[in-house]
Amino acid sequence: MGNITAGSIDAPAVLPYTLAAEVNFQAFGVASTDYHNALYGYIEAEGWKNGYDAQQLKVPYIKLHRDGTTSNQQITETEKIRHIIHHPENRNNSYSEQELKDSIERMRNYIRTHNTI
């Protein structure tokens, strides 16, 4: 049988509430859509979204309109991932596991620099 060793997480939480998805990211490096959504929502709720977006590179995104037509847009990768998560009916876009993790890291870093928890 193997041994289980307890340790501590040195990275501080960035959200002002306990979230299992944040613990999983910090402890095990698990990038989840739940954590991405929570970080995105926190940035929006704090009124930081415009400032965050202004610092991010833009990527192509194909928007699906209600009438079934599409249009090309340039949005942040974070917003692209958010749209893909929230609009599964739009199958014109995709993201990788690495892109999800990178987006989470960018949001965590942004929150750290703007937060006073």
Q: What is the predicted role of each segment?
A:
Residues M1-D67, R112:
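C-terminal lobe/lid and adjacent interdomain/linker elements of RecA-like ASCE P-loop ATPase modules
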Residues V14, T18, E22, Q73, ...:
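Short, well-structured alpha-helical interface segments that form or flank functional binding sites
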Residues L19, Y95-S96:
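A diffuse structural propensity rather than consistent per-protein peaks
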Residues G29, I84, P88-R91, R106-T113:
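Amphipathic alpha-helical interaction surfaces
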Residues T70-S94:
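Histidine-centered, metal-coordinating catalytic motifs and their short helical/loop contexts
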Residues E97-I117:
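Amphipathic, Lys/Arg-enriched alpha-helical patches that create a basic surface
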